[in-house]
Amino acid sequence: TSSMTPGEVMAMCRDKGIKYLDIGAAFGMVELHYMGGVFQHTTFRRDTYPTGGGHRPRAVSYSGDINEDAFRRDFTVNAIYKNILTGRITDPTGGMQDLKNRLLRATSKDPAVIMGDDALRIMRMARFASELGFEAERGTLEAARACAAGLADISPERIREELDRILLSDAKYGIPGGPYRGLELLDELRAIDVIMPELAKGRGIAQKPQYHKYDVLHHCFHAVDCIEPSLTLRLAALLHDVGKPAALQATGCMYTHDRLGADIARGILERLRYPSAVIRDVTALIRNHMFDLRTEAKENTIR
């Protein structure tokens, strides 16, 4: 990142024979392909968001001021600058100390401004917590909870991208327990109620203690942590018991939750714009996850 405008960056690339892609010049972003690496350059800028939760900048203007650029960002740990020529660190928001403390803190003294401007930052906070094993600072956490309803205004594709990263977070840096950590944070913030209200219905629904230690919702979270890092498998694990609340309400028991769950999961995945192949495979796994592999089920259970 620097004060160079996208036009200046692209002109420099043409002059030096460096391949580049315009990945969002309106937001100051240019992708550079150099010496086998891929780098993103972002121009220092200031953002203006619409009132009422537009979640996308209404206006972007370039700035030569690194401090303006720093305080428009989401978290202090994402607002640390290093001069690649001199090695000098510039840290306007105190991100280095938060990095040492493994803490996610909003750049603004009023975290509600950061979360309210773009509610996807709530999902990003959960993703960073799951990938890095960081904790969220209390004020930032409270602001995220207060702004969670704003996730309803975020595009399904943006929600899906962050959810996928949370589900596969332990594969990023090898930190165990990442998916559960991220999902539990989404539950604590009640963000899960907005992005997957059908799944949130499992909160507090107890199960037979001889088979299940957790309520339906947290059983699903733990199941994600216990399966290999495949997106299809982890989506299936997350949603495999999503039909239990509906089955319980309809029949007073949880039989048929696999079939009900497959239909409910399809609705969730279609709403989040997952590819048809992913929807097909995930719903097939959910529909058949009660299959009696050991042929030990009693006749009345099969009925």
Go through each PLM region and give its residues:
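Catalytic cores of the polymerase beta-like nucleotidyltransferase superfamily
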Residues: 1-303
